[in-house]
């Protein structure tokens, strides 16, 4: 019996290409909406709502905003029960906030740190929105599936965070 290679399955390549094209279309749509938004808060709202609506694999999308020495939930769509405020000096969300790019955890099962913020299963991706003035917000995308995020999802989160950073009052 001969083993089949991916080249023998053109439908796989076609499906991956269509998925990448769709992701790019959604990204452009969100970037345009961010540019047109009258304020940073409105841009955050549009980004969260559009990401949740367009990507079924995203079980929850949350925007955290910097508030003094902590981060506060600005908007959450279908996020599991968890704190509304977290410190920026400890915990998994704080660690993600200090990163220079998106942070991804592919399996949350058994992670005591993430369970403290309400996420016990699946996977999570967190992208900091920062400017030269510092941290402004975080985009948190949670999926109840393990390994839900691809490198393209990470690039999408990175580009959205960069677009949102341009919308901040300090930009």
For the regions a language model picked out, list residue spans one by one.
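A short, aliphatic-rich beta-strand micro-motif
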Residues: 122-130
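Helix-loop-beta substructure at the N-terminus of cytosolic sensory domains
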Residues: 23, 28, 32-74
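Acidic/proline- and glycine-rich, intrinsically disordered low-complexity segments
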Residues: 81-103, 109-110
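Signal-transmission linkers at sensory-effector interfaces
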Residues: 1-36, 170
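Short hydrophobic/aromatic beta-strand element in the GNAT-like acyltransferase core
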Residues: 60, 126, 138
């Amino acid at each position: 019996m001969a083993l089949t290679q991916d080249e023998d399955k053109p439908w796989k390549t076609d499906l991956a290409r269509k998925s990448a094209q769709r992701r790019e279309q959604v990204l452009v749509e969100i970037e345009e909406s961010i540019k047109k938004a009258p304020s940073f808060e409105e841009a955050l709202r549009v980004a969260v709502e559009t990401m949740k609506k367009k990507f079924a694999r995203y079980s929850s999308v949350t925007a955290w905003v910097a508030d003094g020495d902590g981060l506060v939930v600005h908007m959450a769509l279908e996020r599991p029960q968890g704190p509304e405020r977290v410190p920026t000096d400890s915990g998994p969300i704080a660690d993600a906030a200090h990163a220079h790019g998106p942070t991804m955890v592919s399996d949350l099962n058994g992670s005591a740190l993430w369970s403290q913020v309400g996420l016990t299963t699946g996977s999570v991706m967190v992208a900091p929105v920062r400017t030269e003035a510092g941290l402004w917000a975080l985009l948190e995308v949670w999926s109840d599936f393990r390994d839900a995020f691809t490198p393209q999802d990470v690039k999408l989160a990175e580009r959205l965070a960069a677009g949102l950073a341009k919308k901040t009052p300090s930009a």
